[in-house]
Amino acid sequence: ILTAAIVLPMTPDNPVLQDGAVLVEGDRIAAVGSLGDMKSLAPEAELIDYGQAVLLPGLINTHSHSGFLRGTAEDLPVWDWLRLFIDPMHRVLTAEDAEIASWLCYAESLLSGTTTSVDMWRYMAGSARAAEALGNRVVMVPYVGEAEGYDYFDTLDDNEALIQQWHGKADGRINVWVGLEHMYYATPEACRRAVAMCERYNTGLHTHSNEAEAEIGEAMKRFGCSPIRALEQLGLLEPERVLLAHCVWLDEDEIALLAEKNIGVAHNPSSNMKLASGSAPIEQLIAAGVAVGIGTDGEKENNNLDMLEEIKIASLLAKLRCMDAAAYGAWNVLRSATIEGARAIGMADQIGSLEPGKQADIIAVRADTPRMTPFLTDGPFMNVHHNLVHGALGGDVCMTMVAG
C-alpha cells in the first residue's frame, strides 16, 4: 500500500484524494481509495507512507532522443542546428556511444519522475539493454533514413530486426515502433514499407512533422501540398497508432485531419522555443479532440529531460501564444503528461492514470519543500495541481515505480 497526503489518480473529473492510497499487487494497481479502505482490503500488505507528498501516475515523455551533446549546439535555428551538429553527430556515432547515452538519459528520466519515454535514437539494441536493466518503460523508435544522402541513419531492415528482437520484451516494458526521422529522409517506397511494417507487427509509427515554418515551403515544392497533407498522400497517417512530434505550423484543416485520423501529437515547448521553431496551437488541437502529450525532445535541444519543468513551460507558452492567462491550465497540462500522453501513444488502457488493472507506474512528489509551500489540499484555494505544474521540479520526485 502506497499512501501520501494527496493522491491524484488523473481519472475523469480530476479527483483529489486526501490521505488516499494505492494498493499494488505485483505489477498492477489493485485498488485506489482511502487509506482505511486499502488497509481493509489488504490488512497484511506492507504500508509505505510518503507523508506530505503527492502520488500520481508516472509521467509520460512522448518525444525524446537519447544523447549526450548538452551545451554543444547552442543558439542556432533548427535547420543550421541539424546541418552543423546533428547530422555530423549521426555520421560518427558508434553503438557504444549510443548505449551509454541511453543509460544516462533513462536514469535521468526515472530520477525525475518519467516512467515511460518515447525514444527516437540509433543502435537501439543497446537502448533496450539499458531499459531492461534500469526498469523504465520505453517505446523505442529507431532513426530511419531511407533516401539518398542519409545512409548513415538506421534502415527499415534495422528497424524490423529490432522489432523482432525486442518488441514486447522485459514483461512488456519495451515496445518497438517504426520510426522515420522525417518524410524528407525517406522515399515513397520506404514510406509504404514503413506502413506495411506497422500492420505486420501491430505496432505504431513515429516521425517529426511541421516543426519549422520552412517545412511548409519545402513540402509545397516537393509534394504540392502542406506537410500534413503530404504525410496523408504517403500513407503515413494510416497506421492504427501514429505519433507526430512538434506540429507547430498547422492550419485549421490540418488540425481537423489529425483529429479525424486519431493522430497523437507530442508537444515539445522547450525545444520549439530554444530552436526558434514557433509555438504549437495546443488549445486548438485539444479542442478538436487530438490527444496531445508532452515531450522534452532531446537533451541537446532542451537541455534536460525534466518533465515537471516541461509541463510548466508548456502551460506558460500556451498562455503567451493565446494571450489568455487561462489557456492550458494546470489540470489540462497534467493530463497531457499522464493520461492524454498515454492516449497519444495508444496505451491509455495500460498506463497514464491510477486505476485498478493498470500497470503500477506511480511517482511521489514531495510537497514539503519551500517551492511547494503553501500546500493547500482543500477549500477554494486548493493548489495541489497548480503547485505541481508551476512549482515542482524533477528533483522533488522522491519515488518512481514502474510495473510495481
Language model region names:
Residues 1-41, 53-55:
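N-terminal metal-binding scaffold of metallo-dependent hydrolase/deaminase domains
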Residues 5, 22, 27, 52, ...:
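Divalent metal-coordination and catalytic microenvironments
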Residues 10, 359-404:
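C-terminal cap of metal-dependent C-N hydrolases
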Residues 54, 73-136, 157-169:
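Alpha-helical scaffold segments that flank or form the walls of functional sites
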Residues 69-100, 134-149, 213-239, 261-264, ...:
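Active-site gating loops and adjacent loop-to-helix segments of metal-dependent hydrolytic enzymes
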Residues 126-249, 253:
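Metal-coordinating catalytic core of metallo-dependent amide/deamination hydrolases
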Residues 233-239, 283-373:
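His/Asp/Glu-enriched, well-ordered alpha-helical/loop segment
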